[in-house]
């Protein structure tokens, strides 16, 4: 019997991405402390948090196959996450203007029944165009990207902020690397292309 697939996230963006695969799934709020540890790298942080989110979902779904994901960006060597408000979003985009920024998305798949966890970090690089203060304010006011790492929604108007995108899977930038996820699911006997 195939275990129940669970997305340990309340993100509407991640839920919409997972729906693209046409699989039945549930979701839950992982409710974990997302604070970085002292001197923790961006890659280690997102990997740890993705695993923690997936494992937290097992509390509600002890026989589930649980997906956890986390994303941060690195600007000038500093880890940034969700801005949470207008002022921080404007600040983040001002810092990113004209720069090349790497986003790191951690993805974990946890089999709550066996305790097996598979996890990996998927990088994605974004080349920001040189933005004026007026463009940044206008963008933030239009899309209000307060709950998106890096303060933009690449699936919407945010695409106008960039000159180039580099990575294996554009879904990674939205928060859920679907190519990597389909590979992980296949290793658990779930083929998204099967009838």
Swiss-Prot record:
Its main location: cytoplasm. CDD domains: Maf (cd00555). It is found in: Cytoplasm. It is an enzyme of class 3 (hydrolase). It catalyses: N(7)-methyl-GTP + H2O = N(7)-methyl-GMP + diphosphate + H(+). Disulfide bonds: none annotated. Its cofactor is a divalent metal cation. The record marks 13, 71, 155 as: Important for substrate specificity. Its EC number is 3.6.1.-. The active site is at 70 (proton acceptor). It comes from the Bacteria. GO terms for biological process: nucleotide metabolic process. SUPFAM superfamilies: ITPase-like. Keywords: Cytoplasm, Hydrolase, Nucleotide metabolism. One of its GO terms (molecular function) is nucleoside triphosphate diphosphatase activity. This is 7-methyl-GTP pyrophosphatase.
């Amino acid at each position: 019997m195939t275990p129940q697939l669970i997305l340990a996230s309340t993100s509407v963006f991640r839920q919409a991405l997972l729906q693209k695969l046409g699989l039945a799934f549930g979701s839950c709020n992982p409710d974990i402390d997302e604070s970085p540890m002292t001197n923790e790298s961006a890659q280690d942080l997102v990997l740890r948090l993705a695993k923690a989110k997936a494992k937290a979902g097992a509390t509600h779904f002890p026989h589930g196959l649980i997906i956890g994901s986390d994303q941060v960006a690195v600007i000038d060597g500093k880890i940034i996450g969700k801005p949470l408000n207008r002022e921080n979003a404007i600040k983040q985009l001002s810092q990113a203007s004209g720069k090349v920024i790497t986003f790191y998305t951690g993805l974990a798949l946890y089999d709550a029944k066996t305790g097996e966890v598979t996890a990996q970090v998927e990088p994605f690089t974004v080349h920001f165009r040189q933005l004026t203060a007026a463009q940044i304010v206008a963008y933030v006011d239009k899309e209000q990207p307060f709950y998106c790492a890096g303060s933009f929604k690449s699936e919407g108007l945010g695409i106008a902020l960039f000159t180039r995108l580099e990575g294996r899977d554009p879904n990674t930038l939205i928060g859920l690397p679907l190519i990597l996820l389909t590979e992980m699911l296949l290793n658990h006997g779930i083929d998204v292309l099967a009838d």
